[in-house]
Design a protein with these regions (language model features):
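Acidic/His- and Gly-rich active-site-bordering loop/insert found
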Residues: 3-129
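Acidic/histidine-rich catalytic neighborhood of metal-dependent amide-processing enzymes
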Residues: 132-141
Length: 141
């Protein structure tokens, strides 16, 4: 790629990011509110986890379908969100991105509620923001 092409590509990517920023913030803030605590947790969080995963998958499915994406839920344990970009049928045209929505227990010391999806101080705060709900939000935006 020529330097000019790279700069044009960067400019287009920045334009798309800014165009979709509010949608990303809304989606991620909502996704962070689901207490999708991993099976290694105990007590109340473990008891509530199956219902929270169902709700999170339902939310993700609604959003995927709104965006014209295909959503397949695999027994509440995994989901595939697919965009059919090419009709060639060639598997080499496909790209897969693996992400997860389970998080470890929040622990203490949070400045904002760990399952609040709070937008403050120029950040989105919540358990899973970096690992791995944030990347899911960027894909879905």
């Amino acid at each position: 790629m020529k330097n000019m092409d790279i700069e044009a590509l960067k400019s287009e990517i920045n334009r798309i990011i800014l165009e979709r920023k509010d949608r990303y913030i809304r989606f991620l803030s909502e996704l962070l509110r689901f207490r999708t605590v991993s099976a290694s947790s105990s007590g109340r969080e473990r008891a509530e986890a199956p219902d929270e995963f169902r709700k999170a998958f339902s939310f993700m499915e609604d959003e995927a379908r709104r965006l014209g994406l295909e959503f397949r839920n695999h027994k509440g344990m995994a989901a595939v969100i697919e965009w059919k970009a090419a009709e060639s049928g060639d598997e080499d045209d496909e790209v897969g991105i693996a992400c997860h929505i389970d998080v470890v227990p929040a622990g203490k010391g949070w400045n904002y509620p760990p399952f609040g999806g709070t937008v403050a101080d120029g950040c989105i705060w919540g358990r899973g923001t970096q690992d791995d709900k944030g990347p899911i939000g960027s894909i879905m935006a």
